[in-house]
Amino acid sequence: MKTIEIFVTTVGAAAPKRLQLELEATVADLLKAAHANGEIEPGGEMLVFLEDEDEPLHHSRKLGDCAVQERAFLHCHKCRHISVTVNYNGTKEKKFAPSVTVARVLKWALKEFGLSGQDAEDKVLRTDAKGQPLEPGTHIGTLVARSCSLALYLTPLVLVEG
Amino acid sequence: MGPDETLFRDHLESDAFLAGTARGKWRLHEGPEDIVWPNPIFWIQSAKEFSPSGGVFLRFDLQNYPQQAPTSCPWNVQSNTRLDYKEWPKGGGNVSRVFNSGWNGSALYAPCDRIAMVRHETWATIHSAWWWKSSFTFVRYLEFVHNCLNPAGHEEKGT
């Protein structure tokens, strides 16, 4: 039976957790394994997404049948969508799956605000206007614990100087 | 093996390091058995506009890790010498600021680099997420360099 290594993130987790599961395992097995390691709050409906995919995986499906491959990144979250608001010189809003990365939201926001080239390169997203820049690979689901909405700020990169 | 090396080798097995390796963000050069302590060498992915090969090797000095912050230098793994300054990554944002051979030819100008941290205490506030703490692992340093060389808003020319 072939075993694959995958990385699973969920609410509040700073880094993905590495799990090893058989390809024959189901998405429900994945949830159970992740829970066994303490990543997921017990109780309530939990959805599982592949990174940057909009549709959750059915719990009864086998990993090997739903494109979960070696070294895949997945996300467990209670929200089906997260309503993301980005503030810059105005406000833009869009719903994303919790497994969407900050990098993808940033690219969307740059396009929405008409930024390109150098104007785009020096922009980062933050959860508050003066906070630390978000890591591009972060799943947005890790940034919201209870609600299914997220406010972000598009701000200039702070240069290393002085 | 000293406690610094023991801890470093534990962190090589951490989920955070292996997740970055799985994403193609970085990798250890050669195998763990080839490490000449305290100088492991890592490859870090880069946008080709900043480094035409698509990455850069960094030779670390992790003496007294993690109580003491790391420092690193761009490295030529063929000649096993410091990378020629002409080949250091160059570009906008923080790229040419961090890879600044005119400041110091053997370290990165970074808030998590122990040589650069000297006399830059204001970075502890301005770049608090990156200012080295003994609770960090070397993965934090790799993240800083990777973010610098791969701005999320950057698009490769010609794409």
Write out the residue ranges for each language-model feature:
Chain A
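Ubiquitin system architectures
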Residues: M1-G162
